[in-house]
Amino acid sequence: MEKVTIAAFGGSLRSKSYNGYLLKTASKNVPEGVDFKIAPIRNLPMYNTDEEENPSEAVVNFKNVLRDADGILVVTPEYNYSIPGFIKNAIDIASRPYSDNVLKGKHVAVMSASIGAFGGMRAQYHLRQVFVYLDMKQINKPEVFINFAQDKFDPNGELRDEKSLLLIQELMKKLAAECRLSRKSLPV
C-alpha cells in the first residue's frame, strides 16, 4: 500500500479544548499507510501581505508541512457561528501569495466539536465555502460534528462516544483513499 501524508491543523489555542482532543483522537485513528503530521499554528503571525516576501520561520515551517502533504485535515471550533480567527489566519497564510498557495488542489476534510447542540456545523459550512475558492477537493461525508462534547470526552481528553469515533475513522479512511487515488492519476 502506498504511503500518503495527511497534515492537520486546528484544535484550539486553549490547552484543554475539545477540538484539541478531537485532533488528538484523529491522529490516533488514521488508517494503515498514513503518515500524520501536525502543522504548527500556535506561533503564526497575523497574515500581512507586507511579509509575504520575507516570511517568518513559523510561516515557512507551517507551509512546508502542508506543501509536503497529500491531504489536509482541519479541526475547528465554532466562534460566533463561524470560523475562529486563528483558523482563518492559518488558511490565509497557507494560501498566499497566490503563486505559493500550498492548499490548492489538496484533498481536505474537516471536523469540529462543540458543547452545543450543533457541534460546530456552522463553522464547517463557512470553511467549506473558503475551500471552494481555494480549489480544494473536499471530503464531504461523513460529516463529523461532535455535539455536547463535554459528555463525549472524558477529563483526560479521550473520546468515549463510539458513534463519533466510527465517523472519525471513516472520514480519515476516505481522506486517505482519495489522496491515494489522486497519486495514481498523476502523470509520471
Q: In which residue ranges do the predicted regions lie?
A:
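N-terminal beta1-alpha1 ligand-phosphate binding loop
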Residues: E2-G33
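Glycine-rich phosphate/pyrophosphate-binding loop and the adjoining helix
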Residues: A7, K137-V188
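Secondary-structure boundary/capping motif
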Residues: S15-Y18, Y47, S82-I83, G119-G120
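A generic structural motif
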Residues: P31-K37, M136-K137
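Short connector loops at secondary-structure junctions
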Residues: K37-P45, V144-Q150
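N-terminal beta-loop-helix "entrance" segment that forms/cooperates
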Residues: I41-E57, F153
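Helix-loop-strand module that forms the ligand-binding subsite of alpha/beta enzymes
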Residues: S56-D135
